[in-house]
Every structure is written in structure tokens, then in C-alpha cells.
């Protein structure tokens, strides 16, 4: 009881507004304060802080709580760590607080997180050493991709040989240093089917950091052409792909000062921009750009510049990412890349100033897509013309700003030579259909013949397509719960480069992922 009273007293005398304002801008609104929610992307403030009652609440994402809960969510820390921060600011000695038994599970989780951080930190210096001794890996980064040594050091790139140290493999070496089998299993470094084999062996390694600089995971690139080109660790206690962007920590100061982020396709592209002196490039971790990524960016920037590869996959990624951004009225532009090239190619062939030049010539995302798709479609064919009209009217419908919609309609009208009045008729038809589709969304989730089941069947027939699909879809995009679980299983198989039979897969889906028998019978 004394512990609870102490915590309550501490919270009551601490200004929650002062804490929240360290993360977002607040403005007075009656007796409360409001601002843009830091936990989801939005363009109109729905996040409120009540200083009298000491709580926050967002009417958009429904997240709320007290000052400790806010710190836990913002810093991705547990209850006790948030409490420590408040103790420091309140002049209370944390050690004097008697933590109740109810916090034991939290402490266990904190202990595991601490051990994973320790393990990852220990690994950093070792993989950096092995990279310095591996000519092939060094030549790939420094010569083939023209990344500067300064940037290699900044991002702490590494390499992991098969024979780790003194004839020991990595697993046995770490055990000899006191790490338990449970910690090694939960670190994500090792194969689930062969727990002593690291999924990163003989790969160029990219340490991935959270916004506080903790190494939370790793990505790896194959240099021999023997496995998946890129892999990332699976999800762990500290490694949440939807909450992370590669390069965000290293580029944080420039992102804050310019209020701008360059979104690229992969790790090497991030390094290419940094080598050019442009230190605000980020990439997702092998998954599609999501609303969670956008929410992270919008805390610190009001502009996103897409710089994806100049191929069909890059165009598809640009379109999907733009569809996510449009409802939130963030300024989006696109860097034009020649077909088949990426930022690292431009850096190597044209020098360190080349990326700044193409960045200066970026164009509005809507205009870029309009130009590209008008060349991609044969507008003399009715079917192609209708497809383009539908594509762009659906895009326009995503915008929440009426003036922006009018500008987009004018641009589409000028490009196609079709009057705005005519386009508006189709637009309102699409808008009505969109409302109907939304109302039926839950019904479709239980429709056995939904497109999601067909997607799963197609991937089962040719799993190699998954490397393309995963760049444009993440599991949360799927409506059907069972389809989502299957997709998560596929992600795990892909990350571990594992072969499988249909019989083994079905057993795994049933026993591990709890996919329903009814769904499994469909394939």
C-alpha cells in the first residue's frame, strides 16, 4: 500500500503536460491540451492531455493512460523503467520503492530484454572485426557499392564467418560466455529448426538500432548467391519490424532539422545517401511500408521523399506507400530513377554529388505516378484508359482535403483530355462503392472465396513469389485471421530460408499458428 501511495503521490505532483511536450507539440484547448497523436498517423489533432486529472487520451486510436503509461508507450520500455525516469525527475530514490509481487513478470521480461541487448552489443565488435578481415565482403561494400569507410563505421557493418572463434561456432562461443539457451533462442540469431546454426553466417551484416541507439536486431546480405539475397531476424522481445526504420537513429538529427525523410528500398540505398552527405534516408526492414512507419516519421518530419528502385517492383512500392500517406496530408515527392537502377548504382556511376542532383529534381508524387502510368498504359485502348481512370480516382478518394482532391482531378483531366465534370461522375460512383465496401469488410473476412485465400494458394504453388509479395503486403493488411497467420508463417519460412513440404506446413500451421481446420481444408 505504501508503494502505491508513493507512486500515486509522485504522479500527482508531476506535470504530465511537461512530459508529453518533450515529444510532441501541444496547444491549450479549454482546460486541457491537444496535439497530433504520437501513436498513429493523423492530420487533425485528436490527442488530449488533461493536466488536472493527470491522464492522456487519443480519440483516434483510443490509446490512453497516465504519465507512466505514456512514457512506457513512447520509449518502448516497461513499467519499472518508466518509473525510474519519473523518480529521477521527482527527486525520489527509485531503490526506496518496494516493488510489489505483481511486477515480477515485468522484471523477468526486462531481464530478458537486457540480456538480448547485451548479446547484440557483444556481437557488434566481433562482426566488425571479422568484416575488417574479409576482403570479399569489404570489396563488395567499399568498391562494388562505393560506400565510404566512414559510413561503414557509422552503421557498424560486420561479417560473420562459419568458424567463429577458436574452432567454436557462434552458439557454443556465446554459451561459453554465459548466455543461456533460452536467451540465444529468443535473440532471433539462430534457426528455429537448427538452434545451433545462426541465420547470419557468411553474410554481410547490418546492425539495426532503435531510436535510442540500442542494437535490437540484424539484417544480412548473401554474397555468394547461395541463399535468399537479404534476410532479417524474426520478431523478438526487442525487434519489432513495424516500429523500426533502418537509418532512423543515425539520421535522427538531420531528420529533425530538415523535417524531411527519404524513404528508400534497402539498407545499401540508405548507406549510399549517407555516403553522399544526405543523412536522412531510411528503409523498412524487408517489409512493406506501413501506417506504423508513417506514424514514426510524422512525429519529426512533414515531408517524405520516395526513392525506390527504377523497376516495376519499385513503382509498385511507390504506389502502395503513397496510398498509405495520402489520407494524412503529408507532403510526398518522388525521386525519378532510371529503370533497373537504385541509389547505390547512381552513387557508383556518377559520384557523390549525383544523389543530391536527382534529389533536387524530385517531383510531386501524384504527378510522378500520373506520368509513369500514362506511359505504362495504352490510353488509346478503352480497357487501359478505364483502368487508369479507376486507379487515379481511387487514389484521389484517399485524400481527406477537398482542395487537394480538386487539384488532383484537374491534373488527371489535363493528362487524359477528359473533362472534370465527366471524371466527377465516375469519382462519386467510386466514392459510393468505397462506402459500401467498407460496410461489407467484415462480411468479406469470412468469405471462403475471398482473394486472400487465393493469394495463399498461389504462394503455396510457387513460394518464390513471396519475395515479391512481402514487399507490398504485410500480415496486418489481410482481413481473414487465418490468412494472416499463414502469412506470418510464410514470413518465418522466408526469413530462415527453409524448405518445406505441404504436409509439414499444414501441421505447423495447425499446431504452432493455430490456423483453423476449416481454413486448412481449403488447400
Swiss-Prot record:
Its cofactor is Zn(2+); Mg(2+). Pfam families: DNAG_N, Toprim_2, Zn_ribbon_DnaG. It is an enzyme of class 2 (transferase). Its EC number is 2.7.7.101. It comes from the Bacteria. It catalyses: ssDNA + n NTP = ssDNA/pppN(pN)n-1 hybrid + (n-1) diphosphate. A zinc finger (CHC2-type) spans 37-61. Mg(2+) 1 binds at residues 265, 309. GO terms for molecular function: DNA binding; DNA-directed RNA polymerase activity; zinc ion binding. The keyword Transcription applies. Keywords: DNA replication, DNA-binding, DNA-directed RNA polymerase, Magnesium, Metal-binding, Nucleotidyltransferase, Primosome, Transcription, Transferase, Zinc, Zinc-finger. Gene3D superfamilies: 3.40.1360.10, DNA primase, catalytic core, N-terminal domain, Zinc finger, CHC2-type domain. GO terms for biological process: DNA replication, synthesis of primer. Monomer. Interacts with DnaB. RNA polymerase that catalyzes the synthesis of short RNA molecules used as primers for DNA polymerase during DNA replication. Belongs to the DnaG primase family. NCBIfam families: dnaG. Contains an N-terminal zinc-binding domain, a central core domain that contains the primase activity, and a C-terminal DnaB-binding domain. PANTHER family: DNA PRIMASE. This is DNA primase. It comes from Borreliella burgdorferi (strain ATCC 35210 / DSM 4680 / CIP 102532 / B31) (Borrelia burgdorferi).
Amino acid at each position: 500500500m505504501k508503494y502505491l501511495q508513493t507512486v500515486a503521490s509522485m504522479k500527482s505532483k508531476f506535470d504530465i503536460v511537461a512530459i508529453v511536450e518533450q515529444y510532441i507539440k501541444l496547444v491549450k484547448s479549454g482546460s486541457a491540451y491537444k496535439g497530433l497523436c504520437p501513436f498513429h498517423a493523423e492530420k487533425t489533432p485528436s490527442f488530449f492531455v488533461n493536466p488536472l486529472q493527470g491522464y492522456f487520451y487519443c480519440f483516434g486510436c483510443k490509446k490512453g493512460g497516465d504519465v507512466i503509461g505514456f512514457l512506457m508507450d513512447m520509449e518502448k520500455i516497461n513499467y519499472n523503467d518508466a518509473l525510474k525516469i519519473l523518480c529521477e525527475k521527482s527527486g525520489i530514490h527509485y531503490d526506496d520503492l518496494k516493488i510489489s509481487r505483481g511486477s515480477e513478470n515485468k522484471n523477468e521480461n526486462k531481464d530478458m530484454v537486457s540480456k538480448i541487448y547485451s548479446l547484440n552489443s557483444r556481437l557488434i565488435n566481433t562482426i566488425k572485426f571479422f568484416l575488417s578481415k574479409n576482403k570479399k565482403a569489404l570489396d563488395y561494400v567499399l568498391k562494388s557499392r562505393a560506400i565510404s569507410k566512414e559510413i561503414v563505421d557509422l552503421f557498424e557493418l560486420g561479417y560473420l564467418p562459419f568458424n567463429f572463434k577458436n574452432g567454436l561456432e557462434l552458439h557454443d562461443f556465446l554459451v561459453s560466455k554465459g548466455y543461456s539457451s533460452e536467451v540465444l533462442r529468443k535473440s532471433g540469431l539462430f534457426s528455429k529448426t537448427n538452434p545451433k546454426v545462426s541465420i547470419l553466417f557468411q553474410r554481410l551484416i547490418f546492425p539495426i538500432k532503435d531510436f535510442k541507439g540500442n542494437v535490437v536486431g540484424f539484417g544480412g546480405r548473401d554474397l555468394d548467391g547461395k541463399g535468399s539475397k537479404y534476410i532479417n531476424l524474426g520478431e523478438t522481445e526487442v525487434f519489432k519490424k513495424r516500429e523500426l526504420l533502418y537509418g532512423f537513429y543515425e539520421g535522427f538529427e538531420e531528420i529533425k532539422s530538415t523535417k524531411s525523410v527519404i524513404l528508400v528500398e534497402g539498407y545499401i540505398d540508405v548507406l549510399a545517401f549517407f555516403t553522399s552527405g544526405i543523412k536522412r534516408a531510411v528503409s523498412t526492414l524487408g517489409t512493406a511500408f506501413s501506417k506504423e512507419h508513417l506514424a514514426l516519421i510524422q512525429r519529426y518530419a512533414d515531408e517524405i521523399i520516395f526513392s525506390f528502385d527504377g523497376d516495376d517492383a519499385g513503382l509498385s512500392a511507390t504506389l502502395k506507400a503513397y496510398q498509405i500517406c495520402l489520407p494524412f496530408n503529408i507532403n510526398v515527392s518522388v525521386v525519378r530513377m532510371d529503370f533497373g537502377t537504385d541509389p547505390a548504382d547512381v552513387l557508383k556511376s556518377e559520384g557523390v554529388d549525383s544523389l543530391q542532383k536527382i534529389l533536387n529534381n524530385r517531383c510531386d508524387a501524384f504527378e510522378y505516378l500520373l506520368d509513369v502510368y500514362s506511359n505504362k498504359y495504352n490510353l488509346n485502348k478503352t480497357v487501359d484508359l478505364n483502368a487508369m481512370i479507376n486507379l487515379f480516382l481511387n487514389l484521389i478518394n484517399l485524400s481527406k482535403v477537398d482542395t487537394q482532391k480538386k487539384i488532383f482531378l484537374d491534373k488527371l483531366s489535363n493528362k487524359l483530355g477528359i473533362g472534370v465534370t465527366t471524371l466527377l461522375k465516375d469519382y462519386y460512383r467510386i466514392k459510393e462503392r468505397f462506402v459500401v465496401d467498407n460496410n461489407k469488410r467484415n462480411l468479406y473476412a469470412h468469405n471462403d472465396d475471398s482473394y486472400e485465400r487465393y493469394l495463399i494458394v498461389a504462394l503455396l504453388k510457387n513460394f518464390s513469389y513471396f519475395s515479391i509479395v512481402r514487399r507490398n503486403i504485410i500480415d496486418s493488411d489481410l482481413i481473414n485471421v487465418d490468412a494472416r497467420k499463414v502469412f506470418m508463417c510464410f514470413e518465418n519460412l522466408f526469413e530462415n530460408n527453409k524448405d518445406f513440404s505441404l504436409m509439414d506446413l499444414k501441421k505447423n500451421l495447425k499446431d504452432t499458428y493455430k490456423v483453423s481446420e476449416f481454413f486448412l481444408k481449403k488447400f
